[in-house]
Amino acid sequence: MVNQKIQDRLAALRAVMKENGVDWYMVPTADFHNSEYVDAYFKVREYLCNFSGSNGTLIVGMDEAGLWTDGRYFIQAERELTGTGVTLYRMLEDNVPTKEEFLQQKMENGQTLGFDGRVVDTRFGLKLEKDLADKQIKIVYGKDLADEVWTDRPALPCHPVLVPDEALFGQNVSEKLAAVRKDMAAHGASGLFLSKLDDLMWLLNIRGADVECNPVALSYAYLTQDECHFFLQDGEVTDVLKAHAAKYHITLHPYEEAAEWMESCTITGSVMCDEGNVSYAFYKILENRAEVIDAANPTELLKAVKNETELANMQEVYLKDSVAVCKFIYWVKKNVGKIPMTEYSAAMYLDHLRSEIDGYLDLSFPTISAYGTNAAMMHYEATEDNCAALAPEGMLLVDSGGQYLGGTTDVTRTIVLGPVSQTIKEHYTAVAKGMLQLTDAKFLYGCTGRNLDILARQPMWDQNIDYKCGTGHGVGYILNVHEGPQGIRWRFTGNQKEVPIEAGMDVTNEPGIYIEGSHGIRTVSYTHLRAHETA
């Protein structure tokens, strides 16, 4: 079946490309801050190709288009791309070209590649420059062509910033700024440009509401050893925030003036930024002003190692959150087959239970409630109009979490609702074994998540089965549910950072088995890493 709506949108984009002399146009999944989850304003890729997953890049030429996404979304992408004319490219699969390889193969000498430089990270942009240089490809990044096609595009999000009691964080802003400036000095940098939203929220002990399920505010910051300049939208600024900023000698600026300010401000010495997070467009500004030092944001590792206050609050929050999940499991098992129940209505009930918890702010991601064959799609999302009815047979996979004043949660349970096959029992057991093996791990300091991944994955590998995603990720503190730099995965792609596991870090532990057309099983538990006391 032809998806005429999407084909018409692609045709409109191609017309705009032609008017602007662009032969190929690239649309990643990102906002101006390289965020994993983005507001509706930034969902350009979904608008143009119908794929709704959280990770994917669309590349459009005059005669063809392709979407690149990872193993979490292969099944979902196949369904959503049907009839669009967009080809699915399964990332990291054999004989599948990367985005760069595809462009090298398809683009002719002297052609033009376009993208919005505000939503492409510097590292990838510089790699494209290098990989396409032999063909003398021109890169244009100063215009959002899709904006001319998406005529009813939502407005840029803008919500007042929350300034919680600083006792909640275990450190005040002065202490955090001092730690960051110490790292800047160690790198020989006189300035630091920050654009990663959760890092900014952590550093200034504030929270926002500009991205669904992620308590962050669209913002930038520029630090020197003596100054801190913070850029955010007028509608995000409150009197409480003004007082908070004044207390810590933070200068507030309009968000939309960040680029212009960086082009004209006084810069002495070098500027530090993380090329994996700063946009290509902003990097070009910095590159023209000063020597740029590519280094990880100091905030990233500092944020990843939770202090005692954060850990204590997280433990309390997880206890309350777990009670809600237990109530939900009891409710589902007691009522399935007795009252009308769907994937969607079950998810709504769990969301309601969480909303009653003291300190509740929001979900930490949209609840995944997947029954039967739908659970084989790792990030399936049921809607009121498109969901399966539950019956007292098979399994319901529920992956969910909450944001609270005190922590962020992420938990998955696969609930057996009735009779299942022997194969499913064996798969369920393998997943449980993997989760328990990783939970009980003791390891030498210096290990990274790549050293530990096999503990969770081995029971699946013993059955010649694998899951096409990582095993675990860090969890933010009243921040993004996916946090780095730590993670547990066996495959190293070169784009991901590897750091030793430190005491105070946290990771999820989430092995799984996904059999297309049959079932999906995942168990996710939150794990706190601590130093092991030896005799």
Predicted features, each with a name:
Residues 381-413, 418-421, 426-427:
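Non-catalytic terminal/interface segments that mediate subunit docking, oligomerization
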Residues 527-535:
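Conserved small/polar residues in nucleotide/adenosyl-binding loops
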Residues 111-131, 141, 145-149, 155-183, ...:
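Extended, domain-scale alpha-helical bundle/helix-rich regions
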Residues 244-285, 295, 420-445, 449-454, ...:
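Conserved catalytic alpha/beta cores of large enzymes that bind or transform nucleotide phosphates
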Residues 119-120, 401-406, 512-516:
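Short, charged beta-turn/beta-strand-edge "cap" motif at the junction between a beta-strand
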